[in-house]
């Protein structure tokens, strides 16, 4: 086993230790990142020469950009790993392609996991309603193919998105779509009986399953946008650096207001705040979460009796475990010469 493979194993161990700490304490100790940087720069330079230095600094710049919407400690791990992936002819805009794969895979897994949690929590609503919408989609497409109606697909998909939004706001409509969704198998059987040629020619069963999966995915995204992030009430005294508030705290001369806003409402609020050039001070967290200064302000407001003793904090998931999984996948794909 050569030195580079030994270093890959050492990095895996360090990432694993960082992941365990991230799960337990939601922090990434600097000692792991610093150890990786020192080891990887030395070994990377030994194997790849100046390419390792280029890889390090170009990835650092990329990670500084990424850290605007993510935790800085998380993305620094990509920078630390860059020198040992600086293979010749593997650079894309001065960044090793293996690091880009690692970032993409890690972020993909990190995005899929909370979506899976939403599906597990709301599957009794999402799946029957998605079956109803797939059935409606199939029926409408049947007539579109017969009469060749132009631009109908755009209208149909707009209806699907609108229907999901409405079902989130109107409980009776949601129950209506859920009940009709149970007719989905009967719809497939009925279509097969009345027009077997069409059913086979357009492979209706397979396309229906694909459409069903697409609509379920759209539903999960809309559920997330309309406020099903998992959140917990947290006492002011228990707030920590990095916590992401679901609440927005608005401070002006007339008093303090705490608003519990979902993603869509937060975006709308920020746009209105910027357009109106509002001079009100706001405490609103991004991917970095609360800073120590934010926590001091919140505690001061609490001591003055201006805000409640508990705030809504979005439940987040440690990112480093996803990096570990991505790291293993990238190494396996490299060794198998797939990437």
Swiss-Prot record:
Cellular compartments annotated: Cell membrane
Gene3D superfamilies registered for this protein in UniProt: 1.20.120.1220
Keyword Cell membrane: yes
GO molecular function: aspartic-type endopeptidase activity
Topology in membrane: Multi-pass membrane protein
Keyword Calcium belongs to the record: no
GO cellular component annotations of the record: plasma membrane
Keywords for the protein's UniProt record, in alphabetical order: Cell membrane, Hydrolase, Membrane, Protease, Transmembrane, Transmembrane helix
EC code(s) of this entry: 3.4.-.-
Disulfides per UniProt: none
Transmembrane segments: 3-23, 27-47, 48-68, 75-95, 99-119, 125-145, 146-166, 180-200, 204-224, 319-339
Broad class of where this protein is predominantly found: membrane
Family: Belongs to the peptidase A24 family.
Main function: Peptidase that processes the N-terminus of prepilins.
Name under which the protein is recorded: Prepilin peptidase EppA
Species the sequence originates in: Methanocaldococcus jannaschii (strain ATCC 43067 / DSM 2661 / JAL-1 / JCM 10045 / NBRC 100440)
